[in-house]
Amino acid sequence: MVKGKSKKVVTSTIQEENVSKEPLAPIVPIVPDILRNEEELVFIEIEKRDKNEIVNVPITQTNPVVQTNNKTNNKNNINNNNNNNNNNNNNNINNNNKNNKVKKTTTTTKKNNEKSNEKQKSVKFANKINESRSARADLTFPVSRIEKMIREGRFTKRCSSDAPVFLAAVLEYLTLEILELSITYANQKNKTRITPQHIHLSICCDAELNDLLKNVTIANGGVPKFIHPILLDTPKKKGHQQNMNENDISKEKDIKSSKN
């Protein structure tokens, strides 16, 4: 027993002398990774400069000094990572708040613009009166009634909103032309009232209207006056007939005298 104790003392003295010069690493038993604690597993994060990739490299336990330094470095790295994450989260929150503020301002501006536009429209339309399509087109013929007639007639499958307006304008132009001609014809006859006969005669006198309204019959329009020249008894024709009769009688007398 004494020998063993003496040996231990000697080894301790040798270790003390060696520690003063160069510290020796203690003998660490080999322990599998499964039995180790989480704190004992140390990882060093190495950032590659060329490629921004992080590599986790496990290190075996060699020196307690290195182990403590690694633990402190890991703690510092963890704290730095936590701080960075907190800063990133704060920045994201601030950015989201800014974006929400911008969205709110844009929505408020849009709503204000819509309200102002509605107010302007209401002011514009308040002064206007509800006008019909014929009034807006400066026409006397009713556009709505003409559209109804077109739809009831079923001349086409579809009827646009512009078709009755154009048709009303054309009909109005034709009626004005016919009325002007009939007024002139009535003034020539010293009449103060336009009759269907005047309208019929005005259409027959105009070549374009006559071509357009060939097959149209006007009620109580009558017939244009036309007497064949043979039926007319003129004084010239009467004298000519008398002369012809006298010549015939003289010829007959000459023929009878020659026979006798």
Swiss-Prot record:
<dbReference type="GO" id="GO:0030527">
    <property type="term" value="F:structural constituent of chromatin"/>
</dbReference>
<feature type="compositionally biased region" description="Basic and acidic residues">
    <location>
        <begin position="248"/>
        <end position="260"/>
    </location>
</feature>
<dbReference type="GO" id="GO:0046982">
    <property type="term" value="F:protein heterodimerization activity"/>
</dbReference>
<dbReference type="GO" id="GO:0000786">
    <property type="term" value="C:nucleosome"/>
</dbReference>
<feature type="region of interest" description="Disordered">
    <location>
        <begin position="236"/>
        <end position="260"/>
    </location>
</feature>
<dbReference type="InterPro" id="IPR007125">
    <property type="entry name" value="Histone_H2A/H2B/H3"/>
</dbReference>
<dbReference type="InterPro" id="IPR032454">
    <property type="entry name" value="Histone_H2A_C"/>
</dbReference>
<dbReference type="GO" id="GO:0005634">
    <property type="term" value="C:nucleus"/>
</dbReference>
<feature type="region of interest" description="Disordered">
    <location>
        <begin position="65"/>
        <end position="122"/>
    </location>
</feature>
<dbReference type="Pfam" id="PF00125">
    <property type="entry name" value="Histone"/>
</dbReference>
<dbReference type="Pfam" id="PF16211">
    <property type="entry name" value="Histone_H2A_C"/>
</dbReference>
<feature type="compositionally biased region" description="Basic and acidic residues">
    <location>
        <begin position="111"/>
        <end position="121"/>
    </location>
</feature>
<comment type="similarity">
    <text>Belongs to the histone H2A family.</text>
</comment>
<dbReference type="GO" id="GO:0003677">
    <property type="term" value="F:DNA binding"/>
</dbReference>
<dbReference type="GO" id="GO:0031507">
    <property type="term" value="P:heterochromatin formation"/>
</dbReference>
<feature type="compositionally biased region" description="Low complexity">
    <location>
        <begin position="67"/>
        <end position="110"/>
    </location>
</feature>
<dbReference type="InterPro" id="IPR009072">
    <property type="entry name" value="Histone-fold"/>
</dbReference>
<protein>
    <recommendedName>
        <fullName>Histone H2A.v1</fullName>
    </recommendedName>
</protein>
<dbReference type="InterPro" id="IPR002119">
    <property type="entry name" value="Histone_H2A"/>
</dbReference>
